[in-house]
């Protein structure tokens, strides 16, 4: 094998010298195509200037020939003859046709047995670009067993850049074809006189080449992306060499069309990308985005189409089930972390301690249906619907005792939170009736779509909780940012807990949220933004109108019901925190001691109607008039006992405030109540949908394209 490598090296040196001599002659033969007389000079500039100049010549696109050669010991004589044919331009066309057929037969034979041979084969795909600045991507069978094999590449590095890159083309052909992208070969392929020998074969062999490469692309289409994704993670050099030029065209199915023939070649359609996740239990994983400690988190950013189905619900382990479907596709995710006791957990983005969270960013629709309620574990049920798709999420963290939890963004201590950012509609239907726990049920509908979320954390005792953004101590919160309308229907009946039900409607849509944290004793709680101690809060930022209808009747607790109407829409929110004993509460923004607060930021004026039916609590009814809307405030405070509240910007004894943080209007309501004597809260919610006319009107204004 070593002798073969040295032989190929000497052959390449001879051919390079001959190409340089012919370049000095100036291309006086005259039979070359337009721009090919400058080929040897550009050829030499590509040798010593790296991929930047290669991409530059790609953008120029001054050539119109593509041909594939197989170089080994058996090919020596034919290669030398083809060089002689190039020197004798009159015989070049007829003689090289025969060699082209022989090389194609040899190439097809090598492609059939390629996956079963040792990974030291040297296929060189030489590509010359056609005029017009576009590149045709040649296709060969990817060898999945070769991987990142560095066979022979170090030997050629000892000689020259030219041979190194040419050898690298032969080496990385599998990686390049695995991604469907011949970026490496296209950028560095036109380096030897193999190309010069076939420059006048365009009119005769182009159609056969197109058909041949189309067949290869259809044959290899199933596992381009999969092999490329695996190898991409293990080699930064391959990322730099394979990623730059035309990866986006491959992922989105762009079309490369040859104009030298009457028959057009449409290439690279319907590329599929498949990602499979291993079902493992991971501990102590340090990453920039997600941290796993006997838990599971998944953040998915699909580009076009993904289908992954995994099943596994073990006891005391992590199970991830994922099926993503965009544009009529479906996705399921089940996350079940085990029952552990964790201390001192710190990460950058999302931290799990016997809890579960999911942050999803989607470009287009996903659909997922999941069912999983284990004992003493966390189950995430997700159904997202965009453009007629649906998603459900159920989060049930286990019952643990956790201490010293610190993170930057979202912290869970036997609780659950979800931050969702969606571009278009979602649909989800969830039902959760826990005992002594937290239940968040949410249904979002955008352009006639809906979503439900159920979050049920357990009852824990937590101490020393500190974070930057959102802190949970046996409580629940949800921060939602949506671009367009939401619709939700929720029902939640819990015992001795907090229930928040919210229905937001934008452009005739509605949403409901139910948050039911448990009854705990918490000490020393400090954070930067929002702090919960056996309470519940919700911060919502919406672009346009909201509609919500809520009903809440609680005993010995605080009930806030809010209806905001923007552009003829309304919203109701009910917040009922539980009765706890809390000490030493300090935060920067909002402090709760057995109380509830809602901060709303809206772009336009709103209408708010609140109704309270509770014992020993505060009731406020507010109606503001902004831009043709009215507002009425009716304070109806009750007698309460307050002690030990220290908050920056908020402190009161039987008092309430309102903060306006809006461009036009923002309503914040504070209701405070002493620690009551009842532990049972029964809530039944009935939510009415909007009428069909509004939905059809909005769908007519916003047509859905599948």
Swiss-Prot record:
<keyword id="KW-0964">Secreted</keyword>
<feature type="compositionally biased region" description="Polar residues">
    <location>
        <begin position="449"/>
        <end position="459"/>
    </location>
</feature>
<feature type="compositionally biased region" description="Basic and acidic residues">
    <location>
        <begin position="340"/>
        <end position="349"/>
    </location>
</feature>
<comment type="subunit">
    <text>Interacts with SERPINA5.</text>
</comment>
<feature type="compositionally biased region" description="Basic and acidic residues">
    <location>
        <begin position="50"/>
        <end position="59"/>
    </location>
</feature>
<feature type="compositionally biased region" description="Basic and acidic residues">
    <location>
        <begin position="580"/>
        <end position="589"/>
    </location>
</feature>
<feature type="region of interest" description="Disordered">
    <location>
        <begin position="131"/>
        <end position="156"/>
    </location>
</feature>
<dbReference type="GO" id="GO:0050817">
    <property type="term" value="P:coagulation"/>
</dbReference>
<comment type="similarity">
    <text>Belongs to the semenogelin family.</text>
</comment>
<feature type="compositionally biased region" description="Basic and acidic residues">
    <location>
        <begin position="400"/>
        <end position="409"/>
    </location>
</feature>
<dbReference type="GO" id="GO:0048240">
    <property type="term" value="P:sperm capacitation"/>
</dbReference>
<keyword id="KW-0732">Signal</keyword>
<keyword id="KW-0677">Repeat</keyword>
<protein>
    <recommendedName>
        <fullName>Semenogelin-2</fullName>
    </recommendedName>
</protein>
<dbReference type="Pfam" id="PF05474">
    <property type="entry name" value="Semenogelin"/>
</dbReference>
<feature type="region of interest" description="Disordered">
    <location>
        <begin position="276"/>
        <end position="678"/>
    </location>
</feature>
<feature type="compositionally biased region" description="Polar residues">
    <location>
        <begin position="329"/>
        <end position="339"/>
    </location>
</feature>
<feature type="compositionally biased region" description="Polar residues">
    <location>
        <begin position="630"/>
        <end position="653"/>
    </location>
</feature>
<feature type="compositionally biased region" description="Polar residues">
    <location>
        <begin position="611"/>
        <end position="622"/>
    </location>
</feature>
<comment type="function">
    <text>Participates in the formation of a gel matrix (sperm coagulum) entrapping the accessory gland secretions and ejaculated spermatozoa.</text>
</comment>
<dbReference type="GO" id="GO:1901318">
    <property type="term" value="P:negative regulation of flagellated sperm motility"/>
</dbReference>
<feature type="compositionally biased region" description="Polar residues">
    <location>
        <begin position="509"/>
        <end position="519"/>
    </location>
</feature>
<feature type="region of interest" description="Disordered">
    <location>
        <begin position="25"/>
        <end position="62"/>
    </location>
</feature>
<feature type="compositionally biased region" description="Polar residues">
    <location>
        <begin position="389"/>
        <end position="399"/>
    </location>
</feature>
<dbReference type="InterPro" id="IPR008836">
    <property type="entry name" value="Semenogelin"/>
</dbReference>
<dbReference type="GO" id="GO:0005576">
    <property type="term" value="C:extracellular region"/>
</dbReference>
<feature type="compositionally biased region" description="Polar residues">
    <location>
        <begin position="137"/>
        <end position="151"/>
    </location>
</feature>
<feature type="compositionally biased region" description="Basic and acidic residues">
    <location>
        <begin position="654"/>
        <end position="670"/>
    </location>
</feature>
<feature type="signal peptide">
    <location>
        <begin position="1"/>
        <end position="23"/>
    </location>
</feature>
<feature type="compositionally biased region" description="Basic and acidic residues">
    <location>
        <begin position="297"/>
        <end position="308"/>
    </location>
</feature>
<feature type="compositionally biased region" description="Basic and acidic residues">
    <location>
        <begin position="520"/>
        <end position="529"/>
    </location>
</feature>
<feature type="compositionally biased region" description="Basic and acidic residues">
    <location>
        <begin position="460"/>
        <end position="469"/>
    </location>
</feature>
<feature type="compositionally biased region" description="Polar residues">
    <location>
        <begin position="569"/>
        <end position="579"/>
    </location>
</feature>
């Amino acid at each position: 094998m070593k002798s073969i490598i040295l032989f190929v090296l000497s052959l390449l040196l001879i051919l390079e010298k001959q190409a340089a001599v012919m370049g000095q002659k100036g291309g006086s033969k005259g039979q070359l195509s337009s721009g090919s007389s400058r080929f040897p000079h550009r050829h030499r500039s590509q040798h010593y200037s790296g991929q930047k100049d290669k991409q530059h010549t790609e953008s120029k696109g001054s050539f119109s020939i593509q041909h594939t050669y197989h170089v080994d010991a058996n090919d020596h004589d034919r290669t030398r003859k083809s060089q002689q044919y190039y020197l004798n331009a009159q015989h070049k066309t007829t003689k090289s046709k025969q060699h082209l057929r022989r090389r194609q037969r040899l190439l097809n034979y090598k492609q059939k047995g390629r996956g079963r041979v040792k990974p030291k084969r040297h296929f060189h795909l030489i590509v010359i670009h056609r005029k017009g600045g576009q590149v045709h991507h040649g296709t060969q069978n990817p060898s999945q067993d070769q991987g990142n094999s560095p066979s022979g590449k170090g030997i050629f590095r000892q000689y020259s850049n030219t041979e190194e890159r040419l050898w690298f083309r032969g080496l990385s052909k599998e990686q390049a074809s695995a991604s469907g992208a011949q970026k490496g070969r296209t950028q560095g392929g036109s380096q030897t006189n193999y190309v010069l020998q076939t420059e006048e074969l365009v009119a005769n062999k182009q159609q056969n080449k197109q058909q041949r490469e189309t067949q290869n692309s259809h044959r290899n289409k199933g596992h381009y992306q999969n092999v490329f994704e695996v190898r991409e993670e293990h080699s930064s050099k391959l990322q730099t060499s394979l990623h730059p030029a035309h990866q986006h065209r491959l992922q989105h199915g762009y079309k490369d069309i040859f104009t030298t023939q009457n028959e057009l070649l449409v290439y690279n359609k319907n590329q599929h990308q498949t990602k499979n996740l291993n079902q493992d239990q991971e501990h102590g994983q340090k990453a920039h985005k997600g941290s796993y400690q006997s838990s599971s988190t998944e953040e998915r950013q699909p580009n076009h189409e993904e289908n992954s189905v995994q099943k596994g619900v073990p006891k005391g382990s992590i199970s991830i089930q994922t099926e993503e479907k965009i544009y009529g596709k479906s996705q399921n995710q089940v996350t079940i972390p085990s029952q552990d006791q964790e201390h001192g957990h710190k990460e950058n983005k999302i931290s799990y301690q016997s809890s579960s969270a999911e942050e999803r960013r989607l470009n287009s629709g996903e659909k997922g249906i999941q069912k999983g309620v284990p004992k003493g574990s966390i189950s995430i049920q997700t159904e997202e619907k965009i453009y007629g798709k649906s998603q459900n999420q159920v989060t049930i963290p286990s019952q643990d005792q956790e201490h010293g939890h610190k993170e930057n963004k979202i912290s869970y201590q036997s609780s659950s939170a979800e931050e969702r950012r969606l571009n278009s509609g979602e649909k989800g239907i969830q039902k959760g009736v826990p005992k002594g726990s937290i239940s968040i049920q949410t249904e979002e509908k955008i352009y006639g779509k809906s979503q439900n979320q159920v979050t049920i954390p357990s009852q824990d005792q937590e101490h020393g909780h500190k974070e930057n953004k959102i802190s949970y101590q046996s409580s629940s919160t949800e921060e939602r940012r949506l671009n367009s309308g939401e619709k939700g229907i929720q029902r939640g009946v819990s015992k001795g807990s907090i229930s928040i039900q919210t229905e937001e409607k934008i452009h005739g849509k509605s949403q409901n949220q139910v948050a039911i944290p448990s009854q705990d004793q918490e000490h020393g709680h400090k954070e930067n933004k929002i702090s919960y101690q056996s309470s519940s809060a919700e911060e919502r930022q919406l672009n346009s109108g909201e509609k919500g209808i809520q009903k809440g009747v609680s005993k010995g607790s605080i009930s806030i019901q809010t209806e905001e109407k923007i552009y003829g829409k309304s919203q109701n929110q009910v917040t009922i925190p539980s009765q706890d004993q809390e000490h030493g509460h300090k935060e920067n923004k909002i402090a709760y001691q057995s109380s509830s607060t809602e901060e709303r930021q809206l772009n336009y004026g709103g209408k708010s109607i609140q109704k309270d039916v509770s014992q020993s609590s505060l009731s406020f009814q507010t109606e503001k008039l902004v831009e043709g809307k009215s507002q009425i405030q009716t304070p109806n405070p009750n007698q309460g006992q307050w002690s030990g509240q220290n908050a920056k910007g908020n402190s009161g004894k039987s008092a309430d405030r309102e903060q306006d943080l809006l461009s036009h209007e923002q309503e914040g309501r504070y209701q405070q109540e002493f620690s009551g004597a009842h532990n049972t809260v029964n809530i039944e919610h009935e939510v009415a949908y909007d009428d069909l006319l509004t939905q059809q009107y909005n769908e007519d204004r916003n047509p859905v394209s599948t």
